[in-house]
């Protein structure tokens, strides 16, 4: 343990990650700043992950049934003794200085409670072009957000124990978007940071169908969560207008204008492409929206070309178009479903002033 830093407990939730679990744990023990404990929480794996963890120098917690990553993280946090909790997914191998760099950020920024890492540009195991695409995009997306952030992601993240306890842990009803939802309950006094110095190599999804299924599922969850965040923000405004004490949770995070623009361009391209069957010259409409899409994400595409060349860039652009299209579809479905649920649950707002005693 490096002197002057708080104690760290590493929490590794795992479910059917026999392929990468050992690499994940060994990477933790190669850290220049050693944690006081490493806790692996097995979420009722069926592929031998539990047996692998039992043979590693870590504390193993076994959940009796599969309960999701939220429950696994909460179980690990409940057993941890460190002043800082470092959550790392079991398909990530941390760089040797990852924990030390996260602690340095916490020390340099006393108001910061959450330090989120980024993915390395190279995957932990390159199993095909789908994985290379996703890894490159995730690396670029996170690296561009180095500094103060407004949302929480917990694939490789350090958080002060006090802040975690103030939030009350992860919502165990959620199996997707649980980390984003966690951040909506984080008191506004706590700063969130993304650090490009906290790096891990990620073994991501490597087949097209699972990639699309995962992306749609998460997009639906994000869309539904967005409704809840907007409703909560509206209630805070009502409280302030009524003279009530405002809630301490942070307000709704800012909109990623670039991502929204890219999604809309992709949707417009897909929806207007059939116009070419009416008249050939109408192909200019989807061509224009597709060109706009490439301009919106131009910096990303130039980054990919520098690393992988023009041939892979063509594949990357096609995958990115598909990703944005499915993401918008999923978020639309999730938002609509969340809006319906919110409308059903929301009580009618009284227009009559409450009586007051004399």
Question: Residue ranges of each PLM-predicted region?
Answer:
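Acidic donor-binding/catalytic loop of UDP-sugar-dependent glycosyltransferases
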Residues: 48, 92-105, 184
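A conserved acidic beta->alpha catalytic loop
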Residues: 27, 34, 42-50, 65, ...
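Short aromatic/hydrophobic "clamp" motif used to bind/position activated sugar donors
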Residues: 85
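Catalytic donor/gating beta->alpha subdomain of glycosyltransferases that bind UDP-sugars
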Residues: 173, 180-247
